[in-house]
Amino acid sequence: MNEEKNYKEKLMKMYVKRELPLLKRNEKFNFACVQCGECCRNRDDILLNPFDVFRLRREKKMSLQDFVEKYCEFYTGNTSKLPLMRIQFRPVYELNGFVTGTRCPFLGQTEGLYHCRVHKAKPFVCFSYPLGRIQELGKETEYLLQNDGTCKGAVKAKDEKIMQVVEDWMGGKEKLDREERFNALYSYFLANYRKWINVDKLAENKKAFSIYKKWLALAAELLYANYDFDSDDDGFLEQFKTNIDAIETISETIVEEFASLVDLHPKS
């Protein structure tokens, strides 16, 4: 886990220094997945965004409660103060009963090769690997190529000169268009929810903590649960926008409703 954390910190430093290759959707990069399953083991950082949760729940045909209990960890972000979800990896046992590591609950194996049991509904961070996404306000989305130097697929691709096109690797034009539309909506929400309500004060003020728990539950419902699971991905995007608007309305209502108890107006 420490190695993974150190690698993430190294990536961030490299990005800030502009030392990571940045790619546009029509550009090529070296990579070839060899189905070794290494990137699906010993991790605690596979966060699920609302679009990921929608597709996985639709694929598994599960309620949010059942999905979380079986596959995920639901927690509150220390900094964001938002309800967040990540995949709960499962322990791997040796014959002697000792735990030797962890693995993704969706990792399968056939004839020595590893595969994802929910391939059609893979979370973004999984199907996009080894690419990460960078989207600055008002600018075209770019993708950074991350490689820790030990990935067998990256080594094979470099040795054999195997190339991928960003757009094709990410599932094609239509899928990537939807991903970028979702990311724009989600980025808007993340950039603005603190402008609707002082969520930091809400979470830290003892008088307001019960109100925060109520807001947190409503936000979780609207971000992850309040969808028609018979709809397609485009339908999800429409519902997601409606749900973001609802969080804004609820937040502003709470600010006014409890004004006599605590000032929850956004920081100026």
Q: Whereabouts are the PLM-identified features?
A:
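Short loop/turn segments that flank or connect secondary-structure elements
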Residues: 1-268
